[in-house]
Curated annotation (Swiss-Prot):
Belongs to the adenylate kinase family. GO terms for molecular function: adenylate kinase activity; ATP binding. It comes from Campylobacter jejuni subsp. jejuni serotype O:23/36 (strain 81-176). Monomer. AMP binds at T35, R40, N61, L62, V63, G88, Y89, P90, R91, Q95, R133, R145. Its main location: cytoplasm. This is Adenylate kinase.
Amino acid sequence: MKELFLIIGAPGSGKTTDASLIAQADATNITHYSTGDLLRAEVASGSELGKTIDSFISKGNLVPLDVVVNTIVCALKAAPTKTIIIDGYPRSVEQMMEFDKVLSEQNEICLKGVIEVRVSEEVAKERVLGRNRGADDNEEVFYNRMKVYTEPLNEILDFYQKKKLHFIIDGERTIEPIVADMKELIKKIQSI
């Protein structure tokens, strides 16, 4: 059975970098997918679906539920390793509920943990506006993305806390201790 870890955090929390470094350090056992990267790759392909996705991403809004869930399910099925890390998901209560439903209807993938990389809005803003990744990294879009992230957050955290799947990592430190703590946490959860 595949073991799935979801990494959530504000824009600029470092969740994608953290997950990527963990997977790179153990590539034979861990696969990392970023919903943002999967969606941006579709946009870059120039497909009709990509154009639809771009109309949402460029404004900092959520991509429709069916598109995101299909993208993630395809990625999980294609994963070459037992352990899978997906970052940036779920981003809404609807995504969470739909994903929970999809996972409960199969027996190949087990959600082992939802790891929140916690940072203040101030640190998140500093990081996002300093990274110049693309058109979706300006102040107006940042505040919209932050609002999109924080509005459903309490309900998402409550849901996973009740399932005893929610874990917190302090994301305001340098990358090395964050990644080390996350690796340790994943190993600990897998041994339970």
